[in-house]
Amino acid sequence: PKGCGALYIRKGVRILPRTFGGEQEKKIRPGTEASPLIAGFGAAVDALPDLKEQHQHISELNAYAKSKLRKIDGIIINSGEDASPYIINIYIPTFMRSQTVLQELSANYGIYVSNGSACAKGKKSHVLTAMKLSDEIIDKSLRISFSRYNTKNDIDKLCTALTDIIKKHPRT
């Protein structure tokens, strides 16, 4: 819940309080604890999946997706092997803009991906620029993101859709 969180402080590390008064929370944060928010935070923590298991699942999906995407003529994978497994960035050279593919995927297949990089909505991605990608590649890049809810079947549908779109629009 908004307004509630946890802070883990390594032994020996001293932090200064942001507000003063009261002796609660080892003099770091004064005030009355918000019990409903704390209960909500506890419920959110309990709802978290096993992070190791989730990371393994996502890593497997990423490897599966990359193997399928590499087989599609007309797709180049921008993401390096050491990139986050939660995201794959691809480039389709035959399209003038990534927006064309985005719209086609969402309107006709119910598949939602993004363009550019997550940290650069509406402007050139500093992440893709730092990867030394050209402006053309950056403009035509698509970002595929994974969550714990995705399956190999989702990836198969995406790859089928991308193949269809590339065939349908040989050059736009």
Q: Which stretches of residues belong to each language-model region?
A:
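Pyridoxal 5′-phosphate
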Residues: 1-172
